[in-house]
């Protein structure tokens, strides 16, 4: 099972917006199932599914983790300038 390394670093002031398509794109970029991705984020698989369906959006600590994971993996988010 792949593991992700999260390093502490200062995030850019511009806030990324994680919509359904971006969450799914990051997960696919990492080659993870919803369950694997959920385990790394410390959320339920159902939560990842709901994010990817647009029922809910990530917020708070989940957004911070998504930003760190995306940065560490070299994922290009559309909000990055």
Language model segments and positions:
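Residue-level signal for the short linker/turn that defines the boundary of a DNA-recognition helix
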Residues: 18-21, 31-32
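Non-catalytic, surface-exposed connector residues within folded enzymatic/regulatory domains
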Residues: 17, 59-60
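DNA major-groove recognition helix of helix-turn-helix
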Residues: 52, 62, 70
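N-terminal flexible/basic segments that precede or flank functional cores
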Residues: 1-17, 66, 71-81
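Short alpha-helical DNA-recognition segment
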Residues: 31-50
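Key DNA-contacting residues within the recognition helix of helix-turn-helix
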Residues: 24, 49-50, 59, 67
